[in-house]
Amino acid sequence: MKMSRSEHSLQALSWRKLYLSRAKLKASSRTSALLSGFAMVAMVEVQLDTNHDYPPGLLIAFSACTTVLVAVHLFALMVSTCILPNIEAVSNVHNLNSVKESPHERMHRHIELAWAFSTVIGTLLFLAGVVLLCWVKFLPIKPKGQKNGTVSAGVAAAITSTSIMVPFGLVFIVFAVHFYRSLVSHKTDRQFQELEELEDLQNELDHREEVSTLQSPGSLYP
């Protein structure tokens, strides 16, 4: 059975959505596994100086940031692990109609949530964790005999890392907002194109019904 141009376009659109969902899940799983692993290693390997009096807020912030970071990435990894095999199974079948068996349409919100957690929220938490780790690591470093009024080398190193990471974090936020707005605009344009394709398909189906009605024997001999 041959497909019309509109039907073929709808099939191509469905497959494009499937491949996009699969790519997002793969990117989320790789990014989440990598960043959560780094966060866990940083928390385990950091060596606190027991002779130094750390500010309680610094330790609480570092612990909370690392824990939330791991939890966010594990959630994204869990969603990717649960949904990705079902999409992979459908994408490996060489049948155009098999795209209807994929759960990517029903699980669209979960896929977008996992992608946002992994690439946006998780990355921001990772940047914040790097800054807090620098403060925890470098704050106790202080040469012997240094006066209390001067800035120690450890504090200077922590301030330097913070001053570098904060502008980079702002640039990342601006880029994320700009990318999201561009993506929404692109999706809006695609929605209009899909509506036009559906309208063309409906007109084509109506035309087929009219032709079949005119060619039927009952229409020629009442």
Swiss-Prot record:
One CC-aspect GO term: plasma membrane
Stored Gene3D superfamilies: Calcium release-activated calcium channel protein Orai
Recorded superkingdom: Eukaryota
Residues in compartment: Cytoplasmic: 1-30, 80-112, 176-222
Extracellular face residues: 49-58, 134-154
Membrane-protein topology: Multi-pass membrane protein
Keywords: Adaptive immunity, Calcium, Calcium channel, Calcium transport, Cell membrane, Glycoprotein, Immunity, Ion channel, Ion transport, Membrane, Transmembrane, Transmembrane helix, Transport
Presence of keyword Ribonucleoprotein: no
One example GO MF annotation: store-operated calcium channel activity
Residues bearing carbohydrate: N148
GO terms classed as biological process: adaptive immune response; positive regulation of calcium ion transport; sarcomere organization; store-operated calcium entry
Record keyword Signal present: no
Coiled coil: none
Family matches, as InterPro entries: CRAC_channel, Orai_sf
Transmembrane segments: 31-48, 59-79, 113-133, 155-175
Subcellular location(s) per record: Cell membrane
PANTHER family xref list: CALCIUM RELEASE-ACTIVATED CALCIUM CHANNEL PROTEIN 1 (PTHR31501:SF3)
Role this protein plays: Ca(2+) release-activated Ca(2+) (CRAC) channel subunit which mediates Ca(2+) influx following depletion of intracellular Ca(2+) stores.
Family, as annotated: Belongs to the Orai family.
Protein name according to UniProt: Calcium release-activated calcium channel protein 1
